[in-house]
Regions:
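Catalytic-core regions of glycoside hydrolase
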Residues: 1-216
């Protein structure tokens, strides 16, 4: 996708408007993302002047403009993930863009803000600056505590799953300390196939207890 193409951005806006006509969430928050691959940025002469984060924000701004043609209250996320974890340098978010932070490349046996984890240090390095840039209003953390597809290497059969409750609790507290009050996560490879394979349900209830503040219940 060449974000230096005005025509391409207009097509994105038009398609976003079509989607908004079909789908209007009660929260007015939309989570339309770029392709879920690393290093997918255009490298034409004009796009070379942009960081991956700047290029992504141009797309999300275009999506928001299209959404608001049908839903004037629409909000659209900026997904900080892989190449777009850094703060945009030259492009500003239009009103209605909010931060969605997804720290995928991390250690799950350590808290996200554990300074002893090199992976986690890299994932959180830009988070305070991202929150300063986008603001904390509507900011959301999208984590991977229940993503057994990730823990299984995206291969089936799924591996046995064990929830790192201590990590989860520390992560939630860290997000709250930064002003992020919306927390969610992927939950994959934990359905019927998992139950048939292992004869027990994964500890999704433990996740709910931590988020509700009833971890000891």
């Amino acid at each position: 996708l060449c974000v230096s193409s005005a025509e391409a951005l207009e097509i994105i806006s038009q398609n976003a408007a079509r989607l908004a006509k079909l789908y209007r969430p009660r929260s007015n928050r939309y989570y339309f993302w770029l392709d879920d691959v690393a290093d997918s940025k255009c490298h034409c002469p004009e796009c070379q002047k942009l960081s991956a984060s700047d290029a992504a924000l141009m797309v999300y701004n275009a999506i928001l403009r299209g959404l608001r043609l049908e839903n004037p209250e629409a909000l659209q996320c900026y997904l900080a993930y892989h190449d777009t974890l850094e703060v945009p340098k030259t492009v500003r978010p239009e009103k209605g863009i909010f931060l969605e932070y997804a720290p995928m490349i991390r250690d799950f046996d350590r808290a996200l803000n554990d300074p002893e984890s090199e992976k986690n240090r890299k994932q959180v390095a830009s988070l305070p600056a991202l929150l300063s840039f986008f603001g904390t209003e509507n900011a959301q953390a999208l984590d991977y505590w229940l993503d057994n597809s990730l823990f299984s290497g995206w291969k089936k059969p799924p591996k046995p799953f064990s929830l790192h409750k201590e990590t989860l609790a520390k992560d939630v507290a860290y997000y709250e300390s930064l002003g992020i009050d919306s927390v969610t996560c992927f939950a994959c490879y934990l359905g019927e196939e998992y139950y048939n394979l292992y004869g027990q349900k994964p500890d999704i209830a433990g996740y709910a207890r931590v988020l509700s503040g009833k971890a000891g219940a």
